[in-house]
Amino acid sequence: MNQEKLIQIKNLKTFFNTEAGIAKAVNDVSFDIYKGEVLGIVGESGSGKSVTSMSINRLIPNPPGEIVNGEILYNGEDLLKLSYDEMSRIRGKDISMIFQEPMTSLNPVLRVRTQMNEILVKHDGLTEEDATQKSIEMLDKVGIPEPSRRINDYPHQFSGGMRQRIMIAMALQCNPALLIADEPTTALDVTIQAQILDLMMDLKESRGDSAILLITHDLAVIAETCDRVIVMYGGVIQEIASIFDLFKNPTSPYTKALMDSIPKMDVKSDRLRALKGMVPSILELGDECKLCSRFDPEDCACCGTKIEPELAEVSPGHFARVSKEFLV
């Protein structure tokens, strides 16, 4: 893997002001994305995965949301200090995104041609005719049949899988350095999921040192596609490791519980193993250990002290949010 850093995220905090209080959706998160790698973020719903990705692209709606602290460095430049126009020149060109819901991500009243061409005209300065030709080529690359005809159709004339292919084509049109894929296979059947993931990996390989940030709750997808993985819960990182280290030696009790919840084909069992309790509301999370409500004191990362452990390096390149006592 290339060791040149593409994105550096330092002490990122993204909060939402609500009538019930301040929701700390992302609370002091730091990690790097390297050129050419596929970095996964996994966790339950409400763990802060999507808010992290939206923060990178500065798409947090304000109000009620706000990035209250941190740095997001792209090639050494802090994206949080850029003006709206400066960020608009990066968003969609250097950093692009595939959104979570393909059925609603496209504008229903505009033809596909109009939506795809807009990106190329804005960022690459192409004429409408040249933009249309490049858009047709991209639709062909992502497997849309008869692209020269279908480019004039409206989104409702495509299936969910085809709409996601269009979203991938749009995201990759300007050869971005970073592609953020926020649960790109949500609401798609298993066969289409596999096709979409294969397509993303094939297109990435053809683009050399471009990176992918893949957000999902599916550990099987993570295992198949990623080089490294971040496990999030409660708005903080619980573990960061290479894909090999994470599956061979998960350290955080939360990561271990996620692994245990995966059905094993070679183990006969009457019932599935599941984490006890529910994901607490972000409004209910304070500065104490986020895992206490899901684990018995002796099994928790804080060993029952309720003090939030620091993210510590447990082996080279492998970090986990556990206390020293937990590692003994």
List the model feature ranges, each with a label:
Residues 173-177:
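A short, proline-enriched helix->beta-strand linker immediately N-terminal to the Walker B motif
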Residues 71, 78, 129-149, 259:
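Conserved ABC ATPase "signature" region
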Residues 79-96, 122, 245-250, 282-285:
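ABC ATPase NBD coupling module
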Residues 184, 188, 192-270:
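P-loop NTP-binding/switch modules centered on Walker-like glycine-rich loops
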Residues 4-5, 22, 145-149, 243-328:
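Short catalytic/signature loops enriched in Gly
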Residues 116, 168, 179, 192, ...:
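Hydrophobic anchor residue at the start of the ABC signature
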